[in-house]
């Protein structure tokens, strides 16, 4: 599902909200979440899951075209851990 599809679904289910209001709310939420992660904060949405940063240590990689070894610096990457309610819902038999 894309962001536009999400906006469309919310507008369909919540008739009193305009598409512009929903779009602004989603963009604001995503921006705030991005800023929180960029400053090293953890985000927890109960029943859904949590977002945090995991550190990837420096390592030696390989250029797939040439086979040449390449040094890759350490970096932080976003990580999502689903909550129990989300895991249970995804694994429900249909």
UniProtKB/Swiss-Prot annotation:
The keyword Metal-binding does not apply. GO terms for molecular function: DNA binding; structural constituent of chromatin. One of its GO terms (cellular component) is chromosome. Gene3D superfamilies: IHF-like DNA-binding proteins. It holds the Pfam family Bac_DNA_binding. Keywords: DNA recombination, DNA-binding, Transcription, Transcription regulation, Translation regulation. PROSITE patterns: HISTONE_LIKE. The keyword DNA-binding applies. SMART domains: BHL (SM00411). GO terms for biological process: DNA recombination; regulation of DNA-templated transcription; regulation of translation. InterPro entries: Hist_DNA-bd, Histone-like_DNA-bd_CS, IHF-like_DNA-bd_dom_sf, IHF_beta. Belongs to the bacterial histone-like protein family. PANTHER family: DNA-BINDING PROTEIN HU, INTEGRATION HOST FACTOR SUBUNIT BETA. Heterodimer of an alpha and a beta chain. This protein is one of the two subunits of integration host factor, a specific DNA-binding protein that functions in genetic recombination as well as in transcriptional and translational control. NCBIfam families: hip, PRK00199.1. This is Integration host factor subunit beta. It comes from Pseudomonas aeruginosa (strain UCBPP-PA14).
